[in-house]
């Protein structure tokens, strides 16, 4: 945020929380459900991907929380608007084309004032939802299903010039790119390689993708969980990638998100979800300034 604070979504308790420079926490709003990705819109409000809540397993020996399946009594998720001055929470979108949003996960605004968001879906003991990519307007006047189905889509981001949209699929460890034709419209195909997208990387082994940020050089920095938790930095032309592992005391099996801040955007703030921490790491390149 411009004042040097951070906004953090908390899935377990459904809170949108402000983190001060000294680490003090302040409640911004209780959104209920599970607060996942958050972005600031053109009106200065926070737009929240609320996944409707999840079961969590607590590992007492490590003081870790690990995500689980769809909870009992689950009714769905949606997009919420939070007034950062008053804490007022309003549901903006809960349905698309008559279908209830299941578990919105990550969100990014374009320079037109609209936003792309993913719906990750929910898992149950014997099956799970199919997910998708959506586009909405901040005034509540339009929400559109753009790509469906996708395999557990998670992080979403945009290239520095806004000409491409990136989506990470969690369980298969894949990062895709699509060209933007106009706001809410991608150059895609109904058949072929995942709606005609360009595969930038598919991770080997048991490594899963979560949320992302883009740096000023256009590299896509994807939070990674699994056997090699850390940040996977993917070149925008798909020519290769590198992997950053956080050493002690920052080791955590659930590196789930990254954003850039500081006066020169060379500080990476990374969420370590199992241990419930946000850490600041010096980054070799400036991050990409967000549109709002």
Provide a role label for each language-model segment:
Residues 1-292:
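Sequence-structural signature of mature extracellular/luminal beta-sheet repeat domains
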């Amino acid at each position: 945020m411009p004042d040097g604070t951070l906004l953090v979504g908390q899935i377990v308790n459904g809170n949108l929380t402000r983190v001060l420079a000294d680490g003090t926490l302040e409640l911004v709003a209780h959104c209920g459900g599970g607060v996942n990705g958050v972005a600031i819109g053109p009106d200065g409000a926070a737009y929240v991907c609320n996944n409707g809540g999840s079961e969590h397993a607590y590992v007492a020996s490590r003081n870790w929380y690990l995500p689980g399946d769809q909870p009992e009594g689950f009714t769905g998720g949606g997009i919420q608007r939070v007034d950062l001055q008053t804490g007022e929470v309003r549901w903006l979108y809960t349905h698309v084309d008559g279908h209830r949003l299941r578990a919105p996960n990550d969100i990014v605004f374009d320079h037109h004032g609209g936003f792309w968001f993913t719906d990750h879906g929910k898992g149950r003991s014997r099956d799970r939802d199919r997910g998708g990519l959506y586009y909405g307007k901040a005034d509540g006047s339009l929400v559109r299903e753009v790509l469906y189905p996708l395999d557990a889509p998670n992080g979403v981001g945009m290239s520095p010039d806004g000409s491409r949209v990136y989506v990470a699929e969690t369980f298969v460890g894949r990062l895709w790119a699509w060209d933007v034709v106009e706001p809410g419209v991608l150059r895609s195909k109904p058949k072929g390689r995942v709606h005609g997208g360009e595969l930038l990387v598919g991770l080997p082994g048991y490594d899963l993708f979560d949320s992302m940020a883009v740096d000023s050089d256009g590299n896509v920095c994807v939070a990674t969980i699994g056997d090699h938790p850390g940040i996977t930095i993917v070149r925008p032309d798909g020519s290769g990638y590198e992997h950053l592992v956080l050493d002690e005391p920052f080791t955590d099996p659930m590196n789930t998100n990254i954003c850039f801040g500081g006066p020169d955007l060379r500080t990476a703030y990374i969420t370590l979800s199992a241990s419930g921490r946000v850490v600041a790491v010096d980054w070799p390149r400036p991050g990409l300034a967000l549109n709002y």
